[in-house]
Amino acid sequence: MKNQFPLVSIITLNYNQAQTTIEFLNSCQSLTYPNYEILVCDMNSTESPTLVISNKEYPNTSLYRSKTNLGFSGGNNWGMSFAKGDYFLIINNDTEVTQNLIELLLIPFEMDPNTGVVCPKIKYYSDKTKIQYAGFSRMNTITGRTKTIGNKEDDQGQYDAIKSTWGAHGAAMLVKKEIIEKVGRFPEKFFLYYEEWDWTTRILNAGYKIFFQGLATVYHKESISVGRKNPMKEYYLTRNRILYMRRNSHGIKFLAFTAFFTLFTVPKTTLNYILRGKFSFLRAFFKGIRDNFSISSYSPV
């Protein structure tokens, strides 16, 4: 039974969103895979999740409470330390799953022993006909950005296949435990954003493959956790875009990125926020740049 149905540890974070987490847990009750555990890792919420998340209602669920907010990277790394599974399903609490999700995500691992990570098709919860993610294009070493394949397209079955992809999506990914043991966990220096791409780069450089499984689906309540657009998001996206390039681009490639960012990104972003009167965003943008001068690019994994 263990070989036929390896244990899958579902790891999700909660931060002052007990109701959202409950909706996620309710959706997990429809899973048809027979061998899984759920770990809810609370990031020092001011509201007590124990008041609403009951082991009686969710008997295969364990709740762990951190004394500090460890962020996406640290929180998931912390959750992995408690997980007993052969595979870890790292998934946002602002998602809802479909019943055969795990079975479908395991297929690429069975097809190719070099599989490291498998991601499902991610669709918008608010409009379930629209795709949010169907894979990532390769990171552009000049801009420090990647393109999301299929984003905002109507789902007409055009991505209903298994295919290799450059990047894993942080909202939902199935990872083999032995890959984490060999490559390491998320780089905690990032806290939020770009950590899964840094991790993706290490996994690919180690010779493993990342697959998109278009027959598996997760519905994502886009950015409930930090908001669709706010200064905190602007800060971490800016800071970590530069940090990612510092860690993964060297020599002439890093010089090309620096030139592009200085001559194009900075003036364009500055003008955009000034014209729109969004000065808190502008301050966050420049703080993200400035902090790269004072932090090391090294991050334990």
Give each language-model segment a name.
Residues 232-240, 251-301:
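Non-catalytic, C-terminal membrane-associated alpha-helical segments of glycosyltransferases
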Residues 47-48, 95-108:
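Acidic donor-binding/catalytic loop of UDP-sugar-dependent glycosyltransferases
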Residues 74, 78, 103-184, 189:
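Acidic/His-rich active-site region of diverse nucleotide-sugar glycosyltransferases
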Residues 26-35:
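Short, acidic, metal-binding catalytic loop of nucleotide-sugar glycosyltransferases
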Residues 36-44, 64-66:
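Short beta-strand/loop segment that forms part of the nucleotide-sugar
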Residues 181, 185-191, 197-219:
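Catalytic donor-sugar/metal-binding loop of nucleotide-sugar-dependent glycosyltransferases
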Residues 65-83, 93-95:
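Glycine-rich, basic loop-to-helix element that forms the pyrophosphate-binding segment
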Residues 88:
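Short aromatic/hydrophobic "clamp" motif used to bind/position activated sugar donors
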